[in-house]
């Protein structure tokens, strides 16, 4: 497995590491980036709420034991816990010692080269 860090930096956010993702050995850098991107997106639930099934009995299709949430979740005034946003264009993924940026389509280096 390769461990990568997902850094939310889009939308004017101060960059912060939100997750470490243990990526199975995949044949290409692009597939490694895609895996980290997919499993830090809210598609069928919440990637950051670490429950396989929600309190209402619905399955959390975005639960992945290979994802470790690094930034604490927030709670509102009523105590409701809220998950993190999806990884988006402008966010970064650190593989080894090199950062990649989520582009409009795919990924780029910090210098703007397509992956």
Mark where each language-model region is.
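Short, conserved turn/kink motifs that form compact alpha/beta structural patches or helix kinks used as
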Residues: 24-95
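A short beta-strand micro-motif
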Residues: 1-12
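Surface-exposed loop/edge segments in extracytoplasmic proteins
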Residues: 13-18
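Short, compact, well-ordered microdomains
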Residues: 83-115
């Amino acid at each position: 497995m390769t461990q990568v860090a997902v850094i939310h930096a889009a939308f004017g956010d101060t960059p912060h590491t939100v997750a470490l993702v243990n990526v199975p050995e995949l044949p290409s850098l692009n597939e490694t980036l895609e895996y980290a991107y997919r499993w830090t997106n809210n598609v069928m639930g919440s990637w950051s709420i670490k429950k396989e099934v929600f309190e209402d009995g619905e399955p959390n299709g975005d639960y992945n034991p290979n994802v470790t949430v690094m930034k604490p979740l927030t709670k509102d005034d009523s105590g409701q816990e809220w998950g993190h946003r999806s990884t988006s264009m402008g966010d970064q993924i650190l593989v080894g010692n090199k950062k990649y940026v989520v582009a409009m389509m795919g990924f780029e280096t910090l210098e703007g080269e397509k992956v």
